[in-house]
From Swiss-Prot:
Annotated active site: Y69
InterPro entries for this protein: ADH-like_C, ADH-like_N, GroES-like_sf, Mito_Enoyl-ACP_Reductase, NAD(P)-bd_dom_sf, PKS_ER
Species name: Caenorhabditis elegans
Record flagged with keyword Phosphoprotein: no
Family: Belongs to the zinc-containing alcohol dehydrogenase family. Quinone oxidoreductase subfamily.
Name of the protein: Enoyl-[acyl-carrier-protein] reductase, mitochondrial
Subunit structure: Homodimer.
Name of a matching Pfam family: ADH_N
Catalysed reaction equations from the record: a 2,3-saturated acyl-[ACP] + NADP(+) = a (2E)-enoyl-[ACP] + NADPH + H(+)
Lineage: Eukaryota, Metazoa, Ecdysozoa, Nematoda, Chromadorea
Length: 344
């Protein structure tokens, strides 16, 4: 009888945990609420119990809470698409993940702004346990986006040239660094600003070969022959002139639309240079890429560059869950440093 009671007691054990939840779509600082909930502290057969360690606030997270992102979790939902955590316990059927592993989400909308979470095994992916917090928490989105765009559209060789706008974005900075590692030259377009000289130095320190303003791009005074690949996250006039830099058979890949303007394409290069236009969304790559080997290969190479210091850490600002309104407001208005929730 005592054994039966002990087993029943164990099965009914629960853990209290805090998480950032939204119940409707609106301005993130107003939509997000800090809630304490109770979850089982023992995973079922196919589940994994994760202690989340750190999670960034990304533009996609903000768009999701605003209701304008393609992926919409069922409401109420926990915020956060990216982050990393440590596996506390695993269910009896779990085979690809073990206790002590560091894991990241394997799908969008998982909800990483929480202290503890019970997740299905196939919703998580193990990563290198030795990566520091700044690398591990942002390992899923920006570095792989840069990596895949450089690998999947044009067969780039050492000495080739890549041009990009939004070069000071997180993806743009990873493009610069990966190109430097691979021996590929970069032409980097940024907006004019008061601290332009400081920004140019920062990007050149990362390995940028050329840094020009959008106005310099539009003037066409500078020539950049042999551009094989162009990466566009702005759209509008910027994409028009960026595509004009492409050599014969070149490709412009669009992965964002910061200007909220349609992507423009120059007629002459499209006809006479046979340039192509493609789109890229990292979430879709994860959805259709069912081979764990290809992902392991990418993660291993990126982790190696991070641990060697060839890819530098992002500057971050650490926030507690209870300071969520301020953190979200800052993430909406300032873009120089990545806002993080530290969850341990």
């Amino acid at each position: 009888m005592l054994k039966v009671l002990s087993l029943r007691s164990a099965l009914q054990r629960a853990a209290s945990t805090r998480q950032l939840v939204y119940e409707g779509y609106r301005n993130p600082p107003e939509a997000i609420q800090l809630k304490t909930v109770t979850i089982a502290d023992k995973p079922s057969a196919d589940q994994v119990l994760v202690q989340w360690i750190a999670a960034p606030i990304n533009p996609a997270d903000l768009n999701q809470i605003q209701g304008v992102y393609p992926v919409k979790p069922a409401l109420p939902a926990v915020g956060g698409n990216e982050g990393f955590g440590k596996v506390i316990s695993v269910g009896s059927n779990v085979s690809s993940i073990k206790v002590g592993d560091h894991v990241i989400p394997d799908r969008s909308g998982l909800g990483t702004w929480r202290e503890l979470g019970l997740h299905q095994e196939n919703d998580l992916f193990p990563i290198d346990n030795t990566l520091s917090m700044e690398y591990a928490a942002t390992f899923q989105v920006n570095p792989p986006t840069a990596y895949r765009m450089l690998k999947d559209f044009i067969d780039l060789k050492k000495g080739d040239t890549v041009a990009q706008n939004g070069a000071n974005s997180a993806v743009g900075k990873h493009v610069i660094q990966i190109c430097r590692i691979l021996g590929i030259k970069t032409v980097n377009v940024v907006r004019s600003r008061d601290n332009l000289e400081e920004l140019v130095k920062e990007l050149k320190d990362l390995g940028a070969d050329e840094v020009i303003t959008q106005e310099e791009l539009y003037s066409r005074k500078k020539k950049f022959p042999g551009v094989k690949l162009a990466l566009n996250c702005v759209g509008g006039r910027s994409s028009l002139f960026l595509a004009s830099l492409l050599d014969h058979g070149g490709c412009m890949v669009t992965y964002g639309g910061m200007s909220k303007q349609p992507v423009d394409c120059p007629t002459g290069p499209l006809i006479f240079k046979d340039i192509s236009l493609r789109g890229f969304w990292m979430s879709r790559w994860y959805d259709i890429q069912k081979s764990p080997e290809k992902r392991h290969e990418m993660y291993q190479e990126l982790a190696g560059w991070m641990k060697s210091g060839e890819i530098k850490k992002q500057e971050i600002v650490k926030n507690r869950l209870e300071d969520h309104a301020k953190a979200l407001d800052t993430a909406l208005s300032k873009f120089d440093k990545k806002q993080f929730f530290v969850l341990e």
